[in-house]
Structure formats: C-alpha cells, structure tokens
Design a protein with these regions (language model features):
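Zn-dependent metallo-beta-lactamase
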Residues: 3, 7-10, 15-72, 199, ...
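Metal-dependent phosphodiesterase/nuclease catalytic metal-binding core
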Residues: 157-305, 316-326, 342-343
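Active-site neighborhood of divalent metal-dependent phosphoester bond hydrolases
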Residues: 121-125, 130-158
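Metal-dependent catalytic neighborhoods of phosphoester/phosphodiester hydrolases
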Residues: 108-115, 313-322
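Active-site metal-binding motif and surrounding structural segment of the metallo-beta-lactamase
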Residues: 77-128, 155-158
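Active-site neighborhood of phospho(di)ester-bond hydrolases with catalytic His/Asp-centered motifs
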Residues: 73-76, 93-101, 130, 244-250, ...
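Conserved beta-strand hairpin/beta-sheet module of binuclear metal-dependent hydrolase folds
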Residues: 38-86, 122-124, 186-188, 237-247, ...
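Divalent metal-dependent hydrolysis catalytic cores, especially in the metallo-beta-lactamase
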Residues: 125-129, 299-310
Length: 343
C-alpha cells in the first residue's frame, strides 16, 4: 500500500523528469532501509564464564539482535550491566530463553527484570523456561514485582525438540542436551527472505513501484500489453537464511546432530580442554575438542566456544584444540564481543 500511495503522489505533483528522480530516490531509500533490517542478525556476548565466580568472565548470557528485536539466551548475574556496556536498548527485549536451572544461567533474572520495572517498562515480557523454573520465578516475581509496570509471561518448554516461538522473521526450536539437570538448547532460524529487485530491469519494463513488494515475494509482472515478464528477469535470489544453534551446558552428545542440521553458526560450551576430559564427563560438560566434533557432526559453518572454566588464564588452547577437529571458523566468546552472524 505504501508503494502505491507514493507512486500516486509523485504522478500528481511532479513533472516527468522530477518524477524519475524522486522515483529512483524513494526506491533507493526504501530498499536500503528494508535490506538493513532484513540483514541484521547480530550476537552480543554478555557473559561466557562457567559457574565459579571469576574476575575474567561473567556468567552465561547472550543477546541476539534480529532485525532490531532482542532475544536473550540465558541470564547470568548482572545481565543488566552487560546490556548497558553494549548500549543495547532494554525496551527492545521481549523474550528471554533459559536453558536450565543452574544459577549461572538464570540468577540474573531478578535483577534484570527489576531494572526493567525501574525503567517503567510497559510491554509484556515472555520467559521461555521449563516448568520447574516457571514455578520458582513466578513466586519470586509475584512477591517483588507484584505491582510492577509490566506483565511477565511464562512459556513452558518441554524436554523434546519443538518450536517454541515464531514470528514473521524467525522460528526458535528447543532441543535436548545432556547435563546433570534437564537442559535445552535453542535453534534460531530465519524464515526465507525476500528476493532482490534489479533496479535497471524494473525501470526498463516500467514496473510501478507499488508492485515491488509482489516482485520480492516472487510474482511475475504483466505489462499493459499483457506480456508476462518472469520474476527472475526482474529480481535476483534472496540472501541465504541464517541459523544459530545455542548448546548450553552439555556433555559430549552426538544426538545434537539429529536436531541441529547445517547451522550457519553454533555456540557450544567448552568448559575444559582435553587435559580435564574425565572431569568434564563427570560434571556433564564438554571439552573444546568435543565441541568441535559436535560442530562437525552438525555440518556447522562456524563455531563459537564459551563457558570457560575459571582455572584457565587464557583461552587460546581452547581455540587450537577445536581447530584440530573442526574445519570451519572457530571463535572464542568474550564479554563485549559482537558478531555479525550474516558474515
């Protein structure tokens, strides 16, 4: 509708040469803004340490910025400080996903949600969490935020793979992991994107601007003399869809590859290096090499390592170990790191 309205206004108020100029300008501005929003898929690392308090790392917490909508994955203590340090807008946070009920992954919820109340948030906030977690935190919030400025909703997640969230842009699936308590991973997956307009071709065939959205959805164009111009003549292929798999605390668990197939990016915990493989198995954690092996099994293109044990003063050994078992790109999580997942 907006395209059609712009087209009508331009025809009524501008001469032909002016019309051509403004026509091209409006197309450029609208297309650039839409492309910018469509492409945004950023990962912000707020915390990548393990359970033991450390001066080097904060507890687990990540934020995905998908088309200017924020999704938090796990919420370690002082998550609101990470928000402030990375200049993220709290009012854009509408969903929080909690993988399991160990404190380093969920004890940040009370502080974060109280901060949102202090900021006079009004829109509802959904916490995706298992039934036990919903029971525990509902009691807490009913006491401390009974007269809060916004509504807190709980979406209960089970132990089987399932789609737990969907909007126009993405789906979010949960899948089981292997830890000492029930633990879920999360798979964020973009829906198919729109095709790109070929500016020179739509001008050549004089396609009205209000039909551009139809073209981006795959429609052909019929000229006034009833000639059908195939869509592929007027548009080019859409960008590839991005997917991000988050594997929270878990022992080595090859069945992850049954749920996660060929993700663009995978985050996998790597609490230890090979030296402490036995300890990792005992505590339900993974080594960097095991994380890399899971990434290989899933067919991932890129691997991010995190959840580092306090005993290490450097994580370079994690990266070296993972690169021996994974052919793709390996990155180390670190507080303050922002990754453009489209690249």
């Amino acid at each position: 509708m907006i395209y059609k309205l712009i087209n009508q206004v331009l025809k009524q108020h501008f001469c032909h040469s002016c019309l051509q100029f403004y026509f091209t300008f409006v197309i450029f501005v609208v297309a650039e803004r839409e492309t910018e929003l469509m492409e945004k898929f950023d990962l912000h690392i707020l915390g990548c340490g393990s359970a033991t308090t450390s001066f080097r790392h904060m507890p687990s917490c990540q934020v995905l910025n998908i088309r200017d909508n924020l999704f938090m994955i796990d919420c370690g203590e002082a998550a609101q400080l990470g928000f402030a340090r990375q200049h993220l807008k709290m009012q854009r946070l509408n969903h929080i996903f909690i993988s399991h009920l160990h404190g380093d992954h969920c004890f940040g919820l009370p502080g974060l949600l109280a901060t949102l109340d202090l900021h006079q948030r009004t829109g509802p906030l959904t916490i995706h969490i298992n039934a036990e977690g919903a029971k525990v935190f509902r009691q807490f919030f009913d006491f401390f935020l009974a007269d809060g400025s916004y509504q807190i909703e709980f979406n209960i997640i089970g132990r089987q793979q399932a789609v737990i969230y969907e909007d126009d842009a993405i789906t979010v699936e949960t899948f089981p992991l292997k830890h000492r308590v029930p633990t879920a991973g999360f798979l964020f997956r973009e829906k198919p994107k729109l095709r790109h307009i070929k500016g020179d071709m739509v001008r050549f065939y004089e396609v009205p601007i209000y039909l551009y959205n139809d073209l981006r959805h795959g429609a052909d164009f019929v000229t006034p003399d009833l000639q059908t111009i195939p869509n592929h003549v007027l548009t080019s292929d859409a960008d590839p869809c991005i997917s991000y798999a988050y594997c929270s605390d878990t022992a080595y668990y090859p069945r992850i590859a049954e749920s996660v197939k060929q993700p663009t990016w995978i985050y996998h915990e790597a609490t230890y290096t090979d030296q402490f493989a036995a300890l990792a198995a005992e505590r339900g954690h993974a080594t960097a090499r095991q994380a890399a092996q899971i990434a290989t099994l899933t067919g991932a293109q890129n691997l991010i390592l995190g959840h580092f044990s306090k005993r290490y003063t450097s994580e370079e050994a994690f990266k070296s170990e993972a690169e021996e078992a994974f052919a793709g790109r390996v990155m180390l999580a670190n507080e303050g790191l922002t990754i453009d997942l489209t690249k």
